Amino acid sequence: MRSCTSFSDEPMTGWMAAAVVTLMIRMCFSVYTMLSESCQRMVIVGYGRCFADRQNLMVCLRSMPNVFTGSCARMRCCLSENLLYRHRNGHIQAEWP
């Protein structure tokens, strides 16, 4: 049985394997960067908090009065291009003026 080869008949060395893994990581990172830059306000909303790949992209809107009782804060999420409120019981469709 032949060992793993790359474009030639020479067996893949440890250095070549590391180079291939590094290239794959760079390609995945460039795709991730492209997707994250396509929506500058993309956040993932869950467990009552909002997360973003960078802190300055986090969009927790607290400027409007809270219509819910308690400490539930309004958040806007661009993940599915829908405006959502985050409530203790989950997502509630927002109706913005």
UniProtKB/Swiss-Prot annotation:
Provide the protein name. Insertion element IS2 uncharacterized 11.1 kDa protein
Specify the superkingdom.
Bacteria
Q: Which UniProt keywords apply?
A: Transposable element
